[in-house]
Amino acid sequence: MFQIFDKLNKLIVEWLQKPIKEYENRSPFNLRDLESVMQPGDILLVDGNQRVSSAIKYLTQSTWSHAAFYLGKNNKFSEKFGTDAILIESDLIDGVITVPLSKYEKFNTRICRPAGLSDFEKEKVIEYMIDSIGLDYDRKNIIDLMRYLLPQPPVPIRFRRRMLALGSGTPSKVICSTLIAKAFQSISYPILPVIQKEKKLKEVSYRGVKHSQYIEKEYYHIRHYSLFVPRDFDLSPFFSTI
């Protein structure tokens, strides 16, 4: 039974990875441009060209279907990962792996950079990503995406994020954006928190005269990592678009 399921799983993966027709590269940047700008800790958002990319872009109403973490080039990690510009990403087949930045040279991309991170915090995020190499891709995500492609459902916008809480949530199995979200949440760095505003009536005194006024407070609640999608890094006020 397991062999049948595994074979079916592979067939679905192959189908999801087939390229879509009429993909257009609108990016004016080449590999050298990307390498000159990117810094370790940056996130590369990718407008993918596969069927799986279409499902993610449809559900998120966004250009971006994939997110990868930039490790850098010719730095202290080069001895282990090579001298090329290296990304860490979660792949549909191979799980969490390193790939050269050149993989996405012909794609539409955007660079998102976390703002205000100390060197220590950045190192912690990088360590988390490196320690994640070898984890499996969350295969429940494959079934979810297949469900939305056959055919693409007319889903109201307010329900799409709920549908994108993809995967089983198993710590040893990840998808691209949830892995990166977990890495930044490991240092309590906000990405796109839920903001709760609360007004309270408070009695204050000014020059001996008492009066009441409303005090407004904002509370930032961290989203569960499984709810993050690639476009959230683009929308986040805590990430700069380069």
What role is predicted for each listed range?
Residues 1-242:
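Cysteine-nucleophile amide-bond enzymes
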